Amino acid sequence: MNTLAVKSIALPAPRPAINQGIDINNEMVLSHTAIYADCLAQVTQENTVENALMVLNPYGTAPLSAYAGVWSLEPAEILVTVQDVAKTAMPVEHLYSLTTGENLLPVLGLVADTENRIVFSQADTPLAAYTLTTQPLPPVDSADVVLGFPIINVTQPAIDADKMAPGFYFITHFDRYNYALDQNGLVRWYVTQDYPSYNFVRIDNGHFLTTSEAKNTYLDMYEFDMMGRLYTFYNLDNQFHHSIWPWDSNTIVAPSEYTSGRPDDLKTNEDGVSVVDLTSGLETAYYDMAKVLDTTRVSRPSGTAPGEAPTVKDWLHINQSYVNETNQLLIASGRHQSAVFGVDLQTQALRFILSTHEDWDDAYQPYLLTPVDSEGVALYDFSKQEDIDAADHDFWTWGQHNVVEIANDAPGMVEFMVFDNGNYRSRDDSKSLLPPDNYSRIVHFVVNINEMTVMRPFEYGKELGARGYSSCVSAKAIQQNGNIVVHFADCTFDENGRAISCQPGESDIIDSQAGSEAMGLLILQEIAPTEKTVLFEATMTSGYYKNAEKNGEGYRYDITSFRVYKMDLYA
């Protein structure tokens, strides 16, 4: 976790709080607290390891999770192993340290729609076994079901397990479900739609923070655990519409806005970044990017996301922000400017812009980065139109998401990896790419803010072509062993299998050959970056075509994913 003490530096002032804070009277929090207390109270001296109290899905929100209530006469270690009775799934193990008296142990990784065997053992000796029968997964999309559970298919099995990063693939679909897959593509955890699914991150205590469009348009933030227990409910004055980033154990950073209208004459949204103290739920700093960048520069891509008022200008659309401590910068991604930029953490002064050099006002020219090779030699001559076009098509990011820091402690150096969606790949319609001719990719950038240059040591995604083209959202996560988990998470196709865009005319040029129906077929991969070897691949789909007549104008947003991680079930 980050080492810079948040309170040791002077950040910009927060906005005045209206209703923001922790709702200590939230009914769901109070109910879950009572359920936990009741489960714990039921554990008596009779509930030894050989006679444990087993409670499946105690909160009604995590159907593949259970509690094991165990009374211990002394401190001891116990290994809990979970597997389906038929032994078709990989076992999930966790070593617990029991305390004297009652213990309530989360049992995670159950398999849906079958009998599960939970074995307690010590020193390789089984002590007791229990059986829990789980319900089927929720229904998938159909004429009667919208926002159903995804259909998951493994398209490349994990045949070289030794090269895989440990853990489970955690995925969140827009207003559908948060869930986790094992490396065989089997669902081993999910929470019900009582919780937001979209803006989803695990914090230091092992809990998750989430917001979504479906839950009061990103104004309700939930903190819950793998058992589906809600711990804290936050009321937000302004939307947390994208990418919550944990700064430290008690502080988060997230894109925000003036949801009820700006205090000036601008009619804009999604153009700020908020810092919030989790212990109080209050904002401690706010960065207003309308005072940093040019609000009049034409957006590309553009558009209005579901739930946004069309009369409000989404000129920047910040979808990711984080703190670079080495250089004391706030780094942010502005999708609608196709720009990643850095501002001074204390003064908000602009430090750099990673973007095509086209159409920026003269005042911003000094902040634009020059692409160079590994020797520092410029890759393009921007006095030539052909070089401008080449950089647009091959170097710069377009409509990017998920800017994630790569550690670099050298002063003046900023490294990150970004998901380059690739919308248009030009500011000129005549030079832009249609979705069937386009691609999305992940890109590693190294920014030298002393020299104002940027280098690109790695990219991946062109190999998939239009199969991986995602006109919005998507994510990736770098693993401890160097592997990269990447989710091409808005791959959408018409009834003829042609790649299409989420908002033609705004997210891409209009494709006259596109059909009238849409269905998502998202790609999850784990790759070894050195060889760009695909170690595992699975797809997620709704399995059900949507169209404007039956599903409304947003039908092309069939199924999307905003975040992907690979981590342990047990935090």
Regions found by a protein language model. Give the residues of each.
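RTX-like calcium-binding, glycine/aspartate-rich low-complexity repeat tracts
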Residues: 1
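Histidine-/acidic-rich catalytic cores in large beta-rich domains
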Residues: 6-85, 96, 100-104, 108-115, ...
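Solvent-exposed beta-strand/loop surfaces of large extracellular or lumenal domains
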Residues: 90-96
